[in-house]
């Protein structure tokens, strides 16, 4: 075994290095400490690392402190009151178990669901789209309205997968069912924490949505989606695909743009063929020689690369299915003591208090939706030269009856902490006074054109930051066929539908004067659709006592730049362009230590105003503001109260 060679650390002694490293100070301290230790007669005069770290950081020296013994376990609690059905309230009592309680997560299982069987319609003469006309579909030879003649039109019934259905058949089809996006977030409409009848904090599903948009880190998003019932895409790949490499620096390359007049005038040097061959060796080796010889430079004009495509698909709760299996949800609570173990509530300080978590559950119609189970297929032959056959589809949707979804395994998992009796007694005897952060939320309706201003009367106490969004009323309307998708988005959502036409057959035109014999096409039954969220706030302003704190800032500044710059790893830039953040703290959510606020209890004339081209008398919206407010929790006499209530 070889011995290590001598190693010499070379230190630069420039002016900047003297300031950053302070090597002279370090040498002087080591010498002084040695002299002092020798004067005291210590057998080992060398300084300790802790003495060195009084002035210099030692990167390779780890530290630890002894810690107070602590243990924890999760305890399951059943509802104290309330019927466990969708649309009701459930109240969970927090038992006197353990010395502290910290994390809490709700567990529920939504039962299987499906839609009812329906009879297939028949062909008839009734006008399509007429109110109450639900029995007949268009007759052959007429357009979709069943009134305008259309030569060659033939109609049949198919299911969402193109399989034929016989008209007039009893119990011929049923609609597919699917869950809304993030059903775990929507399930908890409101969550409240009470002690001895005093509400200490509460929040709504809008707050949960905004926390996810701004605060759930990307590396934990997959796990979060699994918990709240949001499907996660699965990656698939194609087989190998052969690609031609196009390099504008390579000679004899075919023109990518026929009208590029500068193509023959380029003065850049040609790429070395050996360089390209090293990166794209596919046409340098054949099947027999691949891997057996060195890459040989070639001068051929074509270089090849073998790749494969990546595809994504989903099959979770948001995918329409005839039968949705039971769905297990795990929903984390968002009170201050749930987020930070340093703020765990000492249960021993409230020995006789009644501690409750009350949850208002969403109704079934907000969670589950139907997808059309029947489509009308129009096949049209158009004679002539060229002759054409076009196939188009339109959904035939009549709402069915979804079975009542059961709600089972309703449990609240409470993380209880245990400490030694000595520490236990300290918390029993001492009055506890701690800084906490609670939710303050205001939802205000607006229908003013172009500009509006709202007084934030529901906000109070010192505010560190606010999450803000303007949500169109249409997003949660029962009339919106996509409300299952739009309910949590702070903007107007439009659908970008891919061109649905595929060419089934195109005859070859072999003479300039002749038309092709046929040209046929077929559309998708359900075309690929991409939702696009359009932010509806152009500019936003914040004023207090008539002083502009934010004066007509573009919405992108608050939706992208503020969360990008502030908050470190605790805040992320949301995907939703309509979700905005305004902070009065330098380090929002980063540290327990406050770093800035505005006390809206003192500045009561606190307004938010905005400009918009969307909102009007018909296109109304709701302004949602979720603020982090500072208060103080006082634990004494067996109860817990907030220091400030107004």
Swiss-Prot record:
SUPFAM superfamilies: Group II dsDNA viruses VP (SSF49749). It comes from the Viruses. Pfam families: Capsid_NCLDV (PF04451). Keywords: Capsid protein, Host cytoplasm, Host endoplasmic reticulum, Host membrane, Host-virus interaction, Late protein, Membrane, Viral attachment to host cell, Virion, Virus entry into host cell. It is found in: Virion; Host endoplasmic reticulum membrane; Host cytoplasm, Host cytosol. Gene3D superfamilies: Adenovirus Type 2 Hexon, domain 4 (2.70.9.10), Major capsid protein Vp54 (2.70.9.20). One of its GO terms (cellular component) is host cell cytosol. One of its GO terms (biological process) is symbiont entry into host cell. One of its GO terms (molecular function) is structural molecule activity. It is a peripheral membrane protein. InterPro entries: MCP_C (IPR007542), MCP_C_sf (IPR038519), VP_dsDNA_II (IPR016112). Induction: Expressed in the late phase of the viral replicative cycle. Capsid protein that self-assembles to form the pseudo-hexameric capsomers of the icosahedral capsid. The capsid is constructed of 2760 pseudo-hexameric capsomers and 12 pentameric capsomers, with a T=277 symmetry, about 200 nm in diameter. The capsid encapsulates the DNA-containing nucleoid, the core shell and the inner membrane. Plays an essential role in virion assembly. Involved in virus attachment to the host cell. Homotrimer. The membrane-bound form, but not the cytosolic one, assembles into large complexes. Interacts with the minor capsid proteins M1249L and p17; these interactions form a rigid zipper structure that stabilizes the capsomers. Belongs to the NCLDV major capsid protein family. This is Hexon protein p72. The lineage of its organism: Viruses, Varidnaviria, Bamfordvirae, Nucleocytoviricota, Pokkesviricetes.
């Amino acid at each position: 075994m070889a011995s290590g060679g001598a190693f010499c650390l070379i230190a630069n002694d420039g002016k900047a290095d003297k300031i950053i490293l302070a090597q002279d100070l370090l040498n002087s301290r080591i010498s002084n400490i040695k002299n002092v230790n020798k004067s005291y007669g210590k057998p080992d005069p060398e300084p300790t690392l802790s003495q060195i770290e009084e002035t210099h950081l030692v990167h390779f020296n780890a530290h630890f402190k002894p810690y107070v013994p602590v243990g924890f376990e999760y305890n399951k609690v059943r509802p104290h009151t309330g019927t466990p059905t969708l649309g009701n309230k459930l109240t969970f009592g927090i038992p006197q178990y353990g010395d502290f309680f910290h994390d809490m997560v709700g567990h529920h299982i939504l039962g299987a669901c499906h839609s009812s069987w329906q009879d297939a319609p028949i062909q008839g003469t009734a006008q399509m789209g007429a109110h109450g006309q639900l029995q007949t579909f268009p007759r052959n030879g007429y357009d979709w309205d069943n009134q305008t003649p259309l030569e060659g039109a033939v109609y049949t019934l198919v299911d969402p997968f193109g399989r034929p259905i016989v008209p007039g058949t009893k119990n011929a089809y049923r609609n597919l069912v699917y869950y809304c996006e993030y059903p775990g977030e929507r399930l908890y409409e409101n969550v409240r924490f009470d002690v001895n009848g005093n509400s200490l904090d509460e929040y709504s599903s809008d707050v949960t949505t905004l926390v996810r948009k701004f605060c759930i880190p990307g590396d934990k998003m997959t796990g979060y989606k699994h918990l709240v019932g949001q499907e996660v895409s699965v990656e698939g790949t194609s087989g190998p695909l052969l690609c031609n490499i196009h390099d504008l620096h390579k000679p004899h390359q075919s023109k990518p743009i026929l009208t590029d007049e500068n193509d023959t005038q380029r003065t850049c040097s040609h790429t070395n063929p050996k360089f390209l061959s090293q990166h794209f060796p596919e046409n340098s080796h054949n099947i027999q020689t691949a891997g057996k010889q060195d890459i040989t430079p070639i001068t051929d004009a074509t270089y090849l690369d073998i790749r494969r495509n990546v595809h994504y698909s989903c099959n979770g709760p948001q995918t329409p299915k005839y039968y949705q299996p039971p769905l297990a949800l795990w929903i984390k609570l968002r009170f201050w003591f749930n987020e930070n173990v340093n703020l765990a509530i000492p249960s021993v300080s409230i020995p006789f208090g009644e501690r409750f978590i009350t949850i208002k559950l969403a109704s079934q119609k907000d969670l589950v939706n139907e997808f059309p189970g029947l489509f009308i297929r129009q096949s049209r032959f158009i004679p002539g030269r060229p002759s054409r056959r076009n196939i188009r589809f339109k959904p035939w949707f009549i709402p069915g009856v979804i079975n009542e979804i059961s709600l089972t395994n309703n449990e609240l998992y409470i993380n209880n902490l245990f400490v030694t009796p000595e520490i236990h007694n300290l918390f029993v005897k001492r009055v506890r006074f701690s800084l906490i952060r609670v939710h303050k939320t205001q939802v205000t309706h607006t229908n003013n054109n172009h500009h509006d201003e709202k007084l934030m009367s529901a906000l109070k106490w010192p505010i560190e930051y606010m999450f803000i969004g303007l949500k169109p009323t249409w997003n949660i309307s029962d009339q919106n066929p996509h409300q299952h998708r739009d309910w949590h988005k702070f903007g107007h959502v439009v659908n970008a539908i891919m061109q649905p036409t595929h060419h089934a057959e195109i005859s070859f035109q072999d003479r300039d004067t002749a038309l092709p014999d046929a040209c046929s096409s077929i559309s998708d039954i359900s075309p690929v659709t991409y939702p696009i969220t359009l932010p509806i706030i152009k500019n936003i302003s914040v004023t207090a006592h008539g002083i502009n704190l934010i004066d007509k800032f573009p919405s992108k500044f608050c939706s992208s730049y503020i969360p990008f710059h502030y908050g470190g790893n605790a805040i992320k830039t949301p995907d939703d362009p309509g979700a905005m953040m305004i902070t009065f703290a330098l380090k929002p959510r980063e540290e327990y230590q406050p770093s800035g606020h505005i006390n809206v209890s003192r500045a009561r004339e606190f307004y938010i105003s905005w400009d918009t081209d969307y909102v009007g008398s018909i296109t109304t919206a709701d302004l949602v503001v979720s603020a982090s407010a500072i208060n103080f929790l006082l634990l004494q006499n067996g109860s817990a109260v907030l220091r400030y209530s107004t």
